[in-house]
């Protein structure tokens, strides 16, 4: 890795004094093409909204530019980031620092970044991270991140160049389901390998449960401890990752109801969602059940909410907020014929949620190198719709909302090899100081 960085710097330095190339864009394009031939690693454009400490751009890119731990092993990214685009430049922006350290040019537009300064697509994959930054919030409480705008501008260059390369979209596809649906339809039309979604489903499971393919899941619950919408998304991705291979595969959602505050307790009391499942999920994390969704020992009090989904095939599933903890990701389900619920807690590793992105980076890099998504983007398409509809349902809590547009069916291949198995946290432990810089924490003896 070090020699490749030195090669890149050397080429850029040499080209910088070559009079034949009279523009910086031509210089960058030629340098990148030379390095592509010598390095033979997929060339990646990184497009992001904001790059500050612990932002998604930070915690993903630190595992793209250096080797990192995955399942306890030093892992080479296997790709080369050759261009950067930032949509905003807030205080604490890390773009220039990283650009200078790694010799990666920063471009003023998305088009320039994916063309690496030239006039046609010049990368083998695109990393789109539209998370964090100063963007407006609509009347439903949805942060209007420009994921669709990023997507449209990236794909426009692919169309013009008649070259279609793997694309990753961080988190949900869009705050608008119609846009999310259009994005997936476009990638299908042009055979663009498309991956999206959350880091949490790839986390270590404690206990390390597995749900057999074809299991007859009757009811499920996914619990988080964060804000409405932004953390509901991750809980939905956890939910789908656990239930999508049930008997018959995914069938989609026909109805949802949003409950908030006292409504949550009433819904639990009358059996709208299964309290035994909630207890099992919380016990997986804490070792005991709880009595109050809104106030846990050592945590600030919050107003709980629950989103109950009725699936086309009869499954019922609930997203439940419990307490205030950014690292709370718990799941439980009831399988027909089993006496006790099956439950687990998703352990994020040390340093809050930062280390979650090692496994996600590994999945994205696998996607870029193989040219095919390791798990279906339809999961995130369905989740995008479930989340958008939930925010609509929140405007009339306690009242069912029909979701005929979410009858989305899909099946997911086995991708368990892409999940963290916990061995990394034997090397990076809870006692390991978190780096306060662009540094993924790879132990010194492995560098």
Predicted regions and their residues:
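N-terminal secretory signal peptides and thylakoid transit peptides that target proteins
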Residues: 2-19
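Non-transmembrane alpha-helical segments in soluble domains
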Residues: 12, 61, 65, 96, ...
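C-terminal segment of classical bacterial N-terminal signal peptides
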Residues: 22-29
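N-terminal glycine-/serine-/threonine-rich beta1-alpha1-beta2 phosphate-ribose binding loop
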Residues: 31-167, 175-182, 188-190, 244-292, ...
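An acidic- and aromatic-residue-enriched active-site/binding cleft used to recognize and process polar
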Residues: 44, 131, 172-173, 197-200, ...
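Residue-level detector of anion-binding/catalytic polar loops
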Residues: 105, 193, 400
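A contiguous active-site-proximal alpha/beta segment in oxidoreductase catalytic domains
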Residues: 151-152, 161-243
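Contiguous beta-strand/loop segments that form the cofactor/metal-binding neighborhood of enzyme cores
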Residues: 221-224, 234-351, 355-378, 387-391, ...
